[in-house]
């Protein structure tokens, strides 16, 4: 498992595509930016945003 990291902007969107794949994801900028850009997040945090 990758260590928690700060993901912002296009890096965050790319990470969501990788983690969620065909399921897609719902993009809630306020929540995920707070969780993954301002603070580091991990792959499990990202999975919470998959559809």
From Swiss-Prot:
Pfam families from the UniProt entry: Insulin
Keyword presence, Ribonucleoprotein: no
Matches recorded under SUPFAM superfamilies: Insulin-like (SSF56994)
Methyltransferase in keyword set: no
InterPro entries in the record: Insulin (IPR004825), Insulin-like (IPR016179), Insulin-like_sf (IPR036438), Insulin_CS (IPR022353), Insulin_family (IPR022352)
Cystine connections: 8-37, 20-50, 36-41
Main location: secreted
UniProt entry keywords in alphabetical sequence: Carbohydrate metabolism, Disulfide bond, Glucose metabolism, Hormone, Secreted
Cross-referenced CDD domains: IlGF_insulin_like
Cellular location(s): Secreted
Classification via PANTHER family: INSULIN, INSULIN/INSULIN GROWTH FACTOR
Protein's job: Insulin decreases blood glucose concentration. It increases cell permeability to monosaccharides, amino acids and fatty acids. It accelerates glycolysis, the pentose phosphate cycle, and glycogen synthesis in liver.
Family to which this protein belongs: Belongs to the insulin family.
Protein name stated in the entry: Insulin
Species of the source: Caranx sexfasciatus (Bigeye trevally)
